[in-house]
Amino acid sequence: MRCAALTGISPEIIKDLRVGKPRTIELQSTHNIVSIASVKPGPDSHIFMTSIDLEDLDPGDQGICVIVLAISVSMKRMVEFSQGRYYEERERMSARIQVKYCASAVVKQVFREGFFGPTTVEVLKSSCYHAG
């Protein structure tokens, strides 16, 4: 199955999602926001999540496959003041996604579309578990 990849996700978040309850996660990494920008929420919409950094993502890496329930992308405006004077104004894009655990998965192939394009992966859902 080919789906968008979210990388650099905290191992604690992945562990929490494995319990099975839907969770809302806020993303601030540009590459992750770009990767989910074209994803439409729904029961057939999946995302691969892993704690591995984008640059290190390779075939054989493990993570989880989640179902996308909702996506919200927003722009936040921030103003910093220093000693009562205007100091700096900037905007920051963030995305909130609500996801639910689907299955453990292993990367079969990675597709990178440049720095400003989404990262997608071909994954195999784990159907057999080994103790060890």
Feature-to-residue mapping (PLM):
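Compositionally biased, charged N-terminal/linker segments
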Residues: 1-41
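Short beta-strand-centered aromatic/proline hotspots
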Residues: 59-74
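Amphipathic alpha-helical interaction segments
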Residues: 54-55, 71, 75-79
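Contiguous surface segments at macromolecular interaction interfaces
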Residues: 77-132
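Generic structural signal for buried aliphatic residues
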Residues: 23, 45-47, 63
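Short coil-to-beta transition motif at edge beta-strands of beta-rich domains
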Residues: 34-58
